[in-house]
């Protein structure tokens, strides 16, 4: 089986050429690959609006640079304060929930004790009722003297 392959190169956009490859022997067509057109021509395509901003580095002594740094520093400070406040709020909420949990656990203990006392009273009362209730027919049949009177 002989393998015949073909490569066609076509110029592309932004200095990138597209290579089309076909392999006739296997009957499959390979996916096109992107390669740089020339030396130093690789990399991502950058939109013109961002390209012009990044092309000239700012002078560290310029007013615009100082203003941008000041705005950035203020934004960072604000972000850090917000983060600290969020951490404090979370800690406060944790403490509140711990206190509430302790109160609820104490209430559970109290109610458990009360339930135990009430159960004991109920069982004692039920036992007393059972002891006080005796069949009257057994008294009459066991004592023949009272039965005839």
From Swiss-Prot:
CDD domains in the cross-refs: bZIP_CEBPG (cd14713)
- Ranges of compositional bias, category Basic and acidic residues: 56-72
Q: Using the UniProt annotation, give all residue ranges assigned to the region (Basic motif).
A: 66-93
Where composition is biased (Low complexity), the residues are 28-37
Q: Where is this cross-link: Glycyl lysine isopeptide (Lys-Gly) (interchain with G-Cter in SUMO2)?
A: 3
Q: Which stretches make up the bZIP domain?
A: 62-125
Q: Where is this region: Leucine-zipper?
A: 97-118
Keyword Ubl conjugation assigned to the entry: answer is yes
Task: Give the start-end ranges of region Disordered.
Answer: 1-92, 128-149
Q: Which InterPro entries match?
A: bZIP, bZIP_sf, C/EBP
Domain of life from the UniProt record: Eukaryota
Stretches with biased composition (Polar residues): 1-12, 131-149
The cellular component terms of Gene Ontology attached to this UniProt record, alphabetical and capped at eight, are: nucleoplasm; RNA polymerase II transcription regulator complex
State where the protein is found. Nucleus
Gene3D superfamilies reported for this sequence: 1.20.5.170
Q: Which family does it belong to?
A: Belongs to the bZIP family. C/EBP subfamily.
Under the subunit heading, UniProt states: Binds DNA as a dimer and can form stable heterodimers with CEBPA and CEBPB. Interacts with ZNF638; this interaction increases transcriptional activation.
Q: State what protein this is by name.
A: CCAAT/enhancer-binding protein gamma
Q: Which organism is it from?
A: Bos taurus (Bovine)
């Amino acid at each position: 089986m002989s393998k015949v392959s073909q490569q066609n190169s076509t110029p592309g956009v932004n200095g990138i050429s597209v290579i089309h490859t076909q392999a006739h022997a296997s009957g499959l067509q390979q996916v096109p690959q992107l390669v740089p057109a020339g030396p130093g021509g690789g990399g991502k395509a950058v939109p013109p609006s961002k390209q012009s901003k990044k092309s000239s580095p700012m002078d560290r002594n310029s007013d615009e640079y100082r203003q941008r740094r000041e705005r950035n520093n203020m934004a960072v400070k604000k972000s850090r304060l917000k983060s600290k406040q969020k951490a404090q709020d979370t800690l406060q909420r944790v403490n509140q929930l711990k206190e509430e949990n302790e109160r609820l656990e104490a209430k559970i203990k109290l109610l458990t004790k009360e339930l135990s006392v009430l159960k004991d009273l109920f069982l004692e009362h039920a036992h007393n009722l059972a002891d006080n209730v005796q069949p009257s027919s057994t008294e009459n049949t066991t004592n023949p003297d009272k039965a005839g009177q």
